């Protein structure tokens, strides 16, 4: 089996492309079924394994398959599934085989590949991806072991290095941007759209600035109200958004919608009603919640996850020593995993050898039983059994030696000498 990771992320693709290859949570299980099917056929020796990780910053397919054309097949499947021309997608895709796939998984879970260096949210997202793949019956020995090791490495990196210390989160970066536009956030009205983990983090950071008003708009009223009350704010129905948008100076949105929920026309009306007082908008969703054309309006300052990434990276340089330490840990663990993987590769060979030897053994035992049944001398039967079994067991190695070239024969002799050194002693 070969490990392979196919994907795009914030390093290789802009948000405009990432949002087009994102997988909503409810689509992942059926997507895994169709994805695995590309490798299910008469030539497949082992059932393929797969998991899909889809976040704001990355969409990745983790695979274990014996298909030699897995890379091309996976990229073509991703292109077809999202109705994207292959020539538009392929330049942004990375394909990482074997040790590169292992190293990548370890780095992602450890926060080394994140926009926010050392952030911990990705671990929970990876665990969700693994849980979903397991529920879909898409995991097996190889990916199960990969992800178990991945989470162990992530824990080791975070507990033995300072990789997460003093990190600038996306939420903190949003506040910093707001402070560049408004003298005081405390004078502004802030609207949060959504009630998930990212909005909760943003609300925590903005609430610390004591804004004039804090409001939450969410599709589920109860959840929106619960979040708003935590910060002494209030909640409004999402349906009121178009008519109430002009009331807010700062709007932060992060929902799971597959289509924009804030269009150009609605923002144009809000700007007009505000008499061109500026609106600061942060769109943390992928796919995006706010139509990108909104950013072209005067008096509107629209930022996406990629824009916030530039601010986040300003704080990453100071932690390069921790990065080097984390990379060293990861490299050691990659080598350990590859040793396990190499050992797994010979399991089918060993199993086949045992099966073949057992077939020979059964045939000889059956032959000996027939000889005993007709009254042959037991000692002679045992001698015949041992001689015949010995001849058949060494027939394969002997045949290989006789047919090998002189160069290969020397290697075989050396290997077989080692085999028989470990075959056991006749002493009791």
Swiss-Prot record:
Substrate binds at residues 55-58, 114, 119-121, 125. It comes from the Bacteria. The record marks 104 as: Important for activity. SUPFAM superfamilies: Glutamyl tRNA-reductase catalytic, N-terminal domain, Glutamyl tRNA-reductase dimerization domain, NAD(P)-binding Rossmann-fold domains. InterPro entries: 4pyrrol_synth_GluRdtase, 4pyrrol_synth_GluRdtase_dimer, 4pyrrol_synth_GluRdtase_N, GluRdtase_CS, GluRdtase_dimer_dom_sf, GluRdtase_N_sf, NAD(P)-bd_dom_sf, Shikm_DH/Glu-tRNA_Rdtase. NADP(+) binds at residues 194-199. Keywords: NADP, Oxidoreductase, Porphyrin biosynthesis. The keyword Nucleotide-binding does not apply. It is an enzyme of class 1 (oxidoreductase). Homodimer. During catalysis, the active site Cys acts as a nucleophile attacking the alpha-carbonyl group of tRNA-bound glutamate with the formation of a thioester intermediate between enzyme and glutamate, and the concomitant release of tRNA(Glu). The thioester intermediate is finally reduced by direct hydride transfer from NADPH, to form the product GSA. This is Glutamyl-tRNA reductase.
């Amino acid at each position: 089996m070969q490990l392979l990771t196919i994907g795009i992320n914030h390093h290789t693709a802009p948000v405009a492309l990432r949002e087009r290859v994102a997988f909503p949570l409810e689509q992942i299980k059926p997507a895994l079924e169709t994805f695995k099917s590309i490798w299910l056929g008469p030539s497949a020796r082992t059932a393929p394994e797969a998991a899909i990780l889809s976040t704001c910053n990355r969409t990745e397919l983790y695979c274990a398959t014996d298909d030699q054309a897995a890379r091309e097949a996976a990229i073509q499947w991703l292109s077809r599934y999202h109705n994207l021309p292959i020539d538009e997608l392929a330049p942004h895709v990375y394909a990482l085989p074997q040790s590169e796939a292992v190293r990548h998984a370890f780095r992602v879970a450890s926060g080394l590949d994140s926009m926010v260096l050392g952030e911990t949210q990705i671990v929970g997202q990876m665990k969700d991806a693994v849980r979903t793949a397991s529920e879909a019956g898409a995991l097996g020995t190889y990916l199960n072991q990969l992800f178990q090791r991945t989470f162990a490495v992530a824990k080791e990196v975070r507990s033995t290095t300072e990789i997460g210390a003093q990190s600038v989160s996306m939420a903190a970066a949003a506040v910093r941007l707001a402070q560049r536009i408004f003298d005081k956030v405390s004078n502004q009205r802030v609207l949060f759209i959504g009630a998930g983990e990212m909005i909760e983090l943003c609300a925590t950071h903005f609430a610390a600035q004591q804004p004039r008003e804090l409001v939450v708009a969410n599709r589920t009223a109860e959840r929106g109200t619960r979040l708003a009350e935590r910060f002494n704010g209030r909640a409004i129905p999402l349906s009121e958004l178009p008519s109430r948008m002009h009331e807010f100076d700062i709007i932060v949105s992060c929902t799971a919608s597959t289509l924009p929920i804030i269009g150009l026309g609605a923002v144009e009306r809000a700007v007009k009603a505000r008499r061109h007082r500026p609106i600061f908008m942060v769109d943390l969703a992928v796919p995006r919640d706010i139509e990108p054309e909104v950013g072209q309006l005067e008096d509107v300052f629209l930022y996406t996850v990629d824009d916030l990434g530039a601010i986040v990276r300003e704080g990453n340089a100071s932690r390069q020593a921790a990065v080097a330490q984390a990379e060293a840990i990861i490299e050691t663990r990659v080598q350990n995993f590859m040793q396990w993987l190499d050992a797994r590769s010979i399991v089918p060979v060993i199993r086949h050898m045992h099966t073949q030897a057992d077939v020979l053994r059964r045939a000889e035992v059956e032959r000996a039983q027939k000889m005993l049944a007709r009254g042959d001398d037991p000692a002679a039967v045992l001698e015949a059994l041992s001689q015949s079994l010995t001849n058949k067991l060494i027939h394969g190695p002997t045949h290989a030696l006789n047919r090998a070239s002189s160069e290969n024969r020397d290697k075989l002799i050396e290997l077989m000498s080692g085999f028989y050194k470990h075959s056991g002693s006749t002493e009791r």
